[in-house]
Amino acid sequence: MEKVVIVDAIRTPMGRSKGGAFRHVRAEDLSAHLMRSLLSRNPSVDPATLDDIYWGCVQQTLEQGFNIARNAALLAEIPHSVPATTVNRLCGSSMQALHDAARAIMVGDARTCLIGGVEHMGHVPMSHGVDFHPGLSRNVAKAAGMMGLTAEMLARMHGISREMQDRFAARSHQRAAAATQAGHFAAEIVAVCGHDADGVLKRYDADEVIRPETTVESLMALRPAFDPVDGTVTAGSSSALSDGAAAMLIMSGSQARQQGLKARARIRSMAVVGCDPSIMGYGPVPASQLALKRAGLSIADIGVFELNEAFAAQTLPCIKDLGLMDKLDEKVNLNGGAIALGHPLGCSGARISTTLLNLMERRDAQFGLATMCIGLGQGIATVFERI
C-alpha cells in the first residue's frame, strides 16, 4: 500500500466574519487562490497531472453551493480534465477531505491530489437553511443540535468551571498573538487581498480575529451566551466567527520522490468515530485513541497536538481525558486555537493540520496529532509523522 505524504500546506489569514476583511471576497475566490498558490509554489507539479481535488465545506448553498470544489478549480484555471468534489462531515470536512484523498492514494487510484476546505461564515451563516427532521426528536434531544448547549453539558459533566474556561480562552488569544508577533504563522499564511474598514483594497497577511488584549478579567465580564440562567459558556470562550480557507498538496511517496519533491510528513493513521450528540465535543477523545491504536503509538509518543477549540468547555474535558493536562503548555495548541483564530467550519481540519506540521518542524517532533469534534456527535483525528 502506498504511503501518503504531505508536500505543502498553506492557509489564508482568518478574516472576521462580521464586517471583516473578506466581506467582499467570495468563498470560491479564497479557495481558488490557495489552489493557484499551491501550484505556483510547486512548479514541478503539472496541474494536468492532478488526479482529484477534495474540498471541505459545510454550508453548501449560495456561493458555497453546487460543488464549490469544482467552481473554485475552474476559477483557478486548473485543466478541465481534473475532477473535484466537495466533502461534508460538518466541522471535520477538510480533514475528511484529507482522509478521502489519502485513501485514494493508498489504494493506487490517485498519485497527486489537492485537498482543503473553506467556509465564509460572514456570507453563509452556520444555521442558514437548516431544517432538522421533526422525527429526530424521538431519538435526539433538541439541545443536541445546539452546539453551545452541548458544551455546557460537557462542562457540567467534567467539572469545568467558568474560570477554567476563561483562563483557557485567554491563553488561546495570548498564544496566537505571540505566534503572530514571532512570525510563526508566516510559513503557513498566503496573503490575500481584502478590504479595510473604509472599503479600501488591502493585502492581508495576518489573522484579523485574534484579540491580543484579551485577559481573564475581560472575559469574566461577559454574560453566558447559551444558557442565560445557569450557563458558563460565553462568546469569549467559544470559537470566533471567521472566514478562511486552508489547503494541502499530497502525493504518494513514490510520486514525490520521482518529482524530486521533499515530503514534509506522512500520514501515519486516520480515524473517525461517533459519540452521543449531546456531548458532541467529546469526539476527539475516542477518535484520538483509535488513531493512536492504528498507528501503534501511545499518547506519550506524540510531540505536538492540535485540538480544534470549538469551545473551551469541550476542549478542556478532551485534554483532561487524553491525559494531557500536565502537558498543556508543552504540547497542546501552542499557537492558540479556534477561540482566537476562529472556526470556519469547512476550513478548520486542514487549518489545524497545517499549523501542526509547522509546529512539528519548529519543535523537531517526530509525531503530531490533529483532532476535532464534529456537530451531532462525531470525532476525527489524524496522526502525522515527519519524514
UniProtKB/Swiss-Prot annotation:
Keywords: Acyltransferase, Cytoplasm, Fatty acid metabolism, Lipid degradation, Lipid metabolism, Transferase. GO terms for biological process: fatty acid beta-oxidation; phenylacetate catabolic process. InterPro entries: FadA, Thiolase, Thiolase-like, Thiolase-like_sf_Thiolase, Thiolase_acyl_enz_int_AS, Thiolase_AS, Thiolase_C, Thiolase_CS. Its main location: cytoplasm. The keyword Transferase applies. GO terms for cellular component: cytoplasm. It comes from the Bacteria. Heterotetramer of two alpha chains (FadB) and two beta chains (FadA). Catalyzes the final step of fatty acid oxidation in which acetyl-CoA is released and the CoA ester of a fatty acid two carbons shorter is formed. Belongs to the thiolase-like superfamily. Thiolase family. This is 3-ketoacyl-CoA thiolase. It comes from Erwinia tasmaniensis (strain DSM 17950 / CFBP 7177 / CIP 109463 / NCPPB 4357 / Et1/99). The lineage of its organism: Bacteria, Pseudomonadati, Pseudomonadota, Gammaproteobacteria, Enterobacterales.
